[in-house]
Amino acid sequence: MVWENQTFNSIFILLGIFNHSPTHTFLFSLVLGIFSLALMENISMVLLIYIEKQLHTPMYFLLSQLSLMDLMLICTTLPKMIFSYLSGKKSISLAGCGTQIFFYVSLLGAECFLLAVMAYDRYVAICHPLQYTILMNPKLCVFMTVASWTLGSLDGIIVLAAVLSFSYCSSLEIHHFFCDVAALLPLSCTETSAFERLLVICCVVMLIFPVSVIILSYSHVLRAVIHMGSGESRRKAFTTCSSHLSVVGLYYGAAMFMYMRPASKHTPDQDKMVSAFYTILTPMLNPLIYSLRNKEVFRALQKVLKKRKLI
């Protein structure tokens, strides 16, 4: 079969997002700094939640999974881009491209479902506080997390199988800084309309369904917050929920703009900018949004630093 040979023989060229002009060199240095900061933030968040017993709650367990997904996402896309820019070697095999696509799509899907689970967690905590330990028991929490990872991986497998089944007979230059499906489709000489319809279905499942759960959850949360008698309780609930909604808005807004548009509306430069937003900036911003506005995380961090005599 054609694709079996291409898996090992096809070599693509990732054109990247930067050239070597002074302005682009500065921007590359900025991205490198953001990458380093995102690595440090997300690793710290995962370790902090694992180490500190006061953070061993469903909300923080889910937050640790979000940080782990962000960590894996940024490590899927950026190291190759950084290596290509520094070495000048922009080639990538179809197998390497497929690996990027699988992890990228899987992590995007898993994060979509996880954000919906996090919204449900806030709904239970605020609307049914007395039943929280029952409705969000450890077994259910782990089950929903595993389901998020599994559904994301299934989506990655479906997309990967389709991408490897295509034959590529036009220019093998990918106008992107990583192997994104939208950038790879124009290079195929195989009819892709059926796959594009499948991609729309996957986007509906991964984006529209979780967003519906989030909107429904927060409509109940907003109603409950408005009727809270204590100003302090209202402020704490609003702070926690606004952090989550900020992450949801950043992530889903960029993802929907990227994948829910008609193919005719896509342009390489625009796609690269939007992809950079949720594969580079969002993994860096998420830990900041949660940690800077969360006193429990801040206190836990201070406690860990004091234990190690760093402050």
Curated annotation (Swiss-Prot):
The chain crosses the membrane at residues 26-49, 58-79, 101-120, 140-158, 196-219, 237-259, 273-292. Belongs to the G-protein coupled receptor 1 family. InterPro entries: GPCR_Rhodpsn, GPCR_Rhodpsn_7TM, Olfact_rcpt. Keywords: Cell membrane, Disulfide bond, G-protein coupled receptor, Glycoprotein, Membrane, Olfaction, Receptor, Sensory transduction, Transducer, Transmembrane, Transmembrane helix. The gene is OR2M4. It holds the Pfam family 7tm_4. Odorant receptor. It is found in: Cell membrane. Gene3D superfamilies: Rhodopsin 7-helix transmembrane proteins (1.20.1070.10). Residues 50-57, 121-139, 220-236, 293-311 are cytoplasmic. Its main location: membrane. GO terms for molecular function: G protein-coupled receptor activity; olfactory receptor activity. It comes from Homo sapiens (Human). Disulfide bonds join 97-189. GO terms for cellular component: membrane; plasma membrane. CDD domains: 7tmA_OR2T-like (cd15421). This is Olfactory receptor 2M4. It comes from the Eukaryota. Glycans are attached at residue 5.
